[in-house]
């Protein structure tokens, strides 16, 4: 059975194409700075938003019309696998990602849940034999079920801690079996609503203990995927322990985990934390902690996680600038943790949305590489910080001075001349590059 009978293979047709089922800018075979676009971008499909999302909201029921929704239970899970691999093949993406409950329903017991997972994992593994699509990462959903009301690894209930560990243990086994290149930890409920009833130190210490156990078990079974933490400041909890990259990095350092983890950075989560996407990418990059990306965008007018498909070319350009400066994402990728809008409820909309996102990052890639080749931003930054390349500034950078010498230098100064930041000029130049890239 075909779940998308009206859709053929999605291919690159160029900017002048009016075919909605074609890439306008993403040409997977096009060479950009020695690598193909496909090698640079490493796109991934989010199983949950694409194949399980009902498009409901707090004010209304789901609107999604999906041919596989005629089934229920394990039959539905199997139909979703069939639909997923048809979708992967037609849009030609190299990777996909999932939570455990995305691919198989929870049973009435943990043992039954394991059995359901075993059936679907075997089916996915069989499909992967004839597919070019691989598993970028998998993870455990330790936030949806009511048992996680007080958290998972940070729960006030030791039984919930144990249950969460069992799910991650199974997830690591699945990751190894399916060849996952990474394993993600998103602490959806690892946080608190009120300090009045929270043992903050115990919860954070337990979270650290949990991560160490995960590292140990991965080594025990020979799972060599990269561990990734996905920061988010709030929602569903009021304050989450992995607020942003800086907070997460401090946590990892405090618990001696910084050599075992990197970060999976989501654009919309950066927005919720009061940061730009590129800020979070830059902070991770300069600390050698940039592992993977959840490619989406948020609505700056709203205060929650809208998970829109990325179409902001300014954002994709600055994101790709950071990724290119990082030397790529290594084993990571660009996972579309994004859902179509509630009014875009037909199955074809899934293709339109992913095409838009892939084209947007293709544009961002080419513009970012041109900015790097021409040293546009580097020239402005080098000029702005010129004072640290000579004189007292160079002595500061080299660690060859102290407060006594700096005071003596300051006393010898007249009026200090400062330099313009030229930020408006820089933004105008970026606009030029965006407009000229495909002119």
From Swiss-Prot:
GO terms for cellular component: cytoplasm. Transmembrane segments: none annotated. Mg(2+) 1 binds at residues 230, 266, 294, 337. The keyword Glycosyltransferase does not apply. Homotetramer. Belongs to the xylose isomerase family. It is an enzyme of class 5 (isomerase). One of its GO terms (molecular function) is xylose isomerase activity. One of its GO terms (biological process) is D-xylose metabolic process. It comes from the Bacteria. Its cofactor is Mg(2+). It catalyses: alpha-D-xylose = alpha-D-xylulofuranose. PANTHER family: PTHR48408, XYLOSE ISOMERASE (PTHR48408:SF1). Keywords: Carbohydrate metabolism, Cytoplasm, Isomerase, Magnesium, Metal-binding, Xylose metabolism. It comes from Shouchella clausii (strain KSM-K16) (Alkalihalobacillus clausii). This is Xylose isomerase. It is found in: Cytoplasm. The active site is at residues 99, 102. HAMAP family: Xylose_isom_A. SUPFAM superfamilies: Xylose isomerase-like (SSF51658). Gene3D superfamilies: Divalent-metal-dependent TIM barrel enzymes. Mg(2+) 2 binds at residues 266, 269, 305, 307. Its EC number is 5.3.1.5. InterPro entries: Xyl_isomerase-like_sf, Xylose_isom_bac, Xylose_isomerase. Binds 2 magnesium ions per subunit.
């Amino acid at each position: 059975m075909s779940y998308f009978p009206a859709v053929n293979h999605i291919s690159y047709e160029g900017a002048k194409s009016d075919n909605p089922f074609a890439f306008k800018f993403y040409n997977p075979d096009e060479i950009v700075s020695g690598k193909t676009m496909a090698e640079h971008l490493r796109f991934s499909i989010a199983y949950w938003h694409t194949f399980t999302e009902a498009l409901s909201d707090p004010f209304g029921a789901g609107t999604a019309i999906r041919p596989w929704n005629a089934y229920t239970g394990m039959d539905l899970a199997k139909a979703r696998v069939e639909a997923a691999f048809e979708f992967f093949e037609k849009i030609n993406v190299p990777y996909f990602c999932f939570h455990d409950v995305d691919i198989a329903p929870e049973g009435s017991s943990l043992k039954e849940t394991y059995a359901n997972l075993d059936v679907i994992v075997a089916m996915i593994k069989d499909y992967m034999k004839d597919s070019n699509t691989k598993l970028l990462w998998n993870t455990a959903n330790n936030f949806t079920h009511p048992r996680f009301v007080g958290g998972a690894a940070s729960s006030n209930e030791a039984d919930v801690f144990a249950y969460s560990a069992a799910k991650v243990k199974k997830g690591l086994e699945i990751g190894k079996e399916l060849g996952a290149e990474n394993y993600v930890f998103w602490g959806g409920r690892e946080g608190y609503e009120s300090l009045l009833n929270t043992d903050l130190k115990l919860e954070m210490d337990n979270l650290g203990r949990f991560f160490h156990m995960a590292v140990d078990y991965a080594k025990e079974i020979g799972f060599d995927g990269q561990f990734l933490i996905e920061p988010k400041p709030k929602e569903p909890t009021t304050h989450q322990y992995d607020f942003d990259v800086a907070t997460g990095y401090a946590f990892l350092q405090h618990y001696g985990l910084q050599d075992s983890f990197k970060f999976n950075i989501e654009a919309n989560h950066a927005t919720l934390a009061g940061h730009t996407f590129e800020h979070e990418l830059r902070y991770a990059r300069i600390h050698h902690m940039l592992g993977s990306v959840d490619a989406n965008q948020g609505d700056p007018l709203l205060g929650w996680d809208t998970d829109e498909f990325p179409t902001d070319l300014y954002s994709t350009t600055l994101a790709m600038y950071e990724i290119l400066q990082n030397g790529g994402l290594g084993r990571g990728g660009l996972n579309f943790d994004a859902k179509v809008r509630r009014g875009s409820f037909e199955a074809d909309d899934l293709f339109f949305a992913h095409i838009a996102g892939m084209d947007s990052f293709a544009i961002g890639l080419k513009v970012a590489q041109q900015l790097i080749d021409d040293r546009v931003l580097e020239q402005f930054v080098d000029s702005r910080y010129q004072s640290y390349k000579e004189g007292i500034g160079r002595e500061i950078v080299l660690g060859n001075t102290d407060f006594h010498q700096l005071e003596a230098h300051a006393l010898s100064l007249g009026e200090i001349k400062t330099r313009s930041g030229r930020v408006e000029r820089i933004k105008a130049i970026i606009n030029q590059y965006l407009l000229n890239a495909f002119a």
